[in-house]
Amino acid sequence: IRLRRGTADEAYALVARAAALVEQAGLAQAAVQFHDPSGAFRDRDQYIFVFDRSGTYQVFGSTPGNVGKSVFDVRGLDGDFVLREFFAAAQRGGGWVDYEVVNPVTGAVDEKTSYILPLGSERVIGCGVFKPKGGFSLQA
């Protein structure tokens, strides 16, 4: 049985592969693959995102048209919290960050968690999963 949603383990693995590709090929070349809707970096509801310290998206795997937009413009997302906590996780070498965002499928505010890695000191790369009701435990 294949779940309709990606899992935390799959998000973690996707971010690790994506960060390795950026290191090998550079962000511009990697972004082409991250934005390919049938590519290796899109899996069900999972996709890669990258943004800089100002909160500007440089990659938004599910919606490439959001590149250049700000985390502050994402409906139902606390941009200040996300920016602060994602970069704090990156400064620790990577980690999980829990937050709330409007689920684009249901329109409800849902809990989400994203695995974040640093891309140098000025960018973060990540992938998130909506948390099931009742939660789950994360290990990284």
Residues covered by each model-derived region:
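Soluble sensory domains of the PAS superfamily and closely related sensory modules
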Residues: 15, 25, 29, 79-99
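Extracytoplasmic ligand-binding sensor domains of the Cache superfamily
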Residues: 38-92
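Membrane-interface helix-start motif
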Residues: 135-140
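Short loop/turn segments at beta-alpha junctions that line or gate ligand-sensing/allosteric surfaces
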Residues: 75-76, 99-106
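Short, hydrophobic beta-strand elements of compact beta-sandwich sensory domains
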Residues: 1, 15, 112-134
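A short beta-strand signature within small-molecule sensing/ligand-binding domains used
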Residues: 46, 106-116
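Extracellular/periplasmic ligand-binding regions of membrane signal-transduction receptors
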Residues: 3-33
